[in-house]
């Protein structure tokens, strides 16, 4: 049994990885900031110790896993090197783990977490599958056949992995603090494609993914009969979204997803494609799909009287549009109110007009102050720059949260990758509910 210490254990990937190693029988602990982060709930539920940062946390005979947000000058990393311990980056360590399984990486600018969560749930309906999801959830199942994991393109971290399969949901310009432009993003995905050992499953409507070259087959999914696997006869019901799936032009089977929105059907198609290629039992796959409950911070709902309170991680214009679309399709007779907290100054600056356009699809818009990051906590613009671009938009904070009570028959979308859950909880407290998120 190895003793692992995770520096930055509350990070979404680090939290998941720590849980996996714990499940596989290792001794696990970690350190992080003392502020509450939603990922710590799962860690505490498994009895994994979370410590404040301190060089004295590092002991002899530990293996230290270094989170991507922390430099080698961090006090705990310095102490680990002084003790001549093995210090392994998150990406390199995960890359070592996946080689023990038939692995499926899920990557793309948007939809990674939802698709990874769906993939792990559905595959476990037929074969034991360990998984690492970007919502801070991870599980290591002994004697697993498969390993499903989220692979992030930021700073080209995903190039540490050599998976058997890769699902590529889309290529889009994001992380403007690192990538120069869309061509730079494409180059990263192109390099990743050459790491894949068996096959790539890619969204057929993405113009950039259509240009990807690989040493393995590329299977495209979508809504067109020119795709290798596609959905037709899509019907929205009170149970979710029903659709027929065709493979190479031939009817494969009828499926029901309990979710709503075109993007959820696309996610399901990618997962069904993997299941088809690995010859998993389609009856088991269908049953598992119908019981998928979603992942953390992806359209998580709480209903109070005539209001539906939604917690969602959307922090890019396309993700915001998809979340609003889901609300419209699932609740066509309700008003849609967007409460959004921009994440990082560089992203807000780069997509200012796009944020305004996507948020304007809601009936009302409320904006929070911009949330910075460890690497970037100031910028040239303010939230007022975005407010000025959206008709009727206004600033909201914990002191003014009661303004949301006026929307009697509405879906209230709390969106963002920062600490917007503080605002959600403040509102829920006013409504008489506590600790929902």
UniProtKB/Swiss-Prot annotation:
ATP binds at residues 108-114. The keyword ATP-binding applies. It is found in: Cytoplasm. One of its GO terms (molecular function) is UDP-N-acetylmuramate-L-alanine ligase activity. Optimum pH is 8.2-8.8. It is an enzyme of class 6 (ligase). Cell wall formation. Can also use L-serine and glycine, but they are incorporated 4.3- and 7-fold less rapidly, respectively, than L-alanine. Belongs to the MurCDEF family. This is UDP-N-acetylmuramate--L-alanine ligase.
């Amino acid at each position: 049994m190895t003793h692992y210490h995770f520096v930055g254990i509350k990070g979404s990937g680090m939290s998941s990885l720590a849980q996996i190693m714990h499940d596989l029988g290792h001794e696990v602990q970690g350190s992080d900031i003392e502020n509450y982060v939603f990922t710590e709930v799962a860690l505490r539920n498994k009895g994994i110790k979370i410590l404040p940062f301190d060089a004295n946390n590092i002991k002899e005979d530990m293996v230290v896993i270094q989170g991507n947000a922390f430099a080698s000058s961090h006090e705990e990393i310095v102490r680990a090197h002084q003790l001549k311990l093995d210090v392994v980056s998150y990406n390199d360590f995960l890359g070592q783990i996946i080689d023990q399984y038939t692995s499926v990486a899920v990557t793309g600018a948007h939809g990674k977490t939802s698709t990874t969560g769906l993939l792990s749930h559905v595959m476990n309906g037929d074969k034991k599958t360990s998984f690492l999801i970007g919502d801070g959830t991870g599980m290591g199942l002994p004697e697993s056949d498969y390993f499903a994991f989220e692979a992030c393109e930021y700073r080209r971290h995903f190039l540490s992995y050599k998976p058997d399969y890769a699902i590529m949901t889309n290529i889009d310009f994001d992380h403007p603090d690192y990538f120069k432009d869309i061509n730079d993003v494409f180059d990263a995905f192109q390099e990743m494609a050459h790491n894949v050992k068996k096959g790539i499953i890619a969204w057929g409507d993405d113009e950039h993914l259509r240009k990807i070259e690989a040493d393995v087959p590329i299977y495209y999914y979508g809504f067109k009969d020119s795709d290798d696997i596609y959905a037709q006869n899509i019907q929205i019901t009170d149970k979710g979204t029903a659709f027929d799936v065709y493979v190479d032009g031939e009817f494969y089977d009828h499926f029901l997803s309990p979710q709503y929105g075109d993007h959820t059907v696309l996610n399901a198609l990618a997962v069904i494609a993997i299941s088809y290629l690995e010859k998993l039992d389609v009856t088991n796959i269908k049953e598992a799909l119908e019981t998928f409950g979603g992942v953390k911070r992806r359209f998580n709902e709480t209903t109070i009287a005539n209001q539906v309170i939604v917690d969602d991680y959307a922090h890019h214009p396309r993700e915001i549009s998809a979340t609003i679309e889901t609300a419209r399709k699932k609740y066509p007779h309700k008003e849609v109110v967007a409460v959004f907290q921009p994440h990082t100054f560089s992203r807000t600056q780069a997509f200012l007009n796009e944020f305004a356009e996507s948020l304007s699809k809601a009936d009302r818009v409320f904006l929070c102050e911009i949330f910075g990051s460890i690497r970037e906590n100031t910028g040239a613009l303010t939230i007022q720059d975005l407010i000025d671009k959206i008709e009727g938009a206004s600033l909201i904070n914990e002191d003014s949260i009661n303004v949301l009570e006026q929307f009697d028959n509405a879906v209230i979308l709390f969106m963002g990758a920062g600490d917007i859950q503080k605002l959600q909880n403040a509102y829920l407290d006013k409504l008489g509910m506590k600790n929902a998120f």
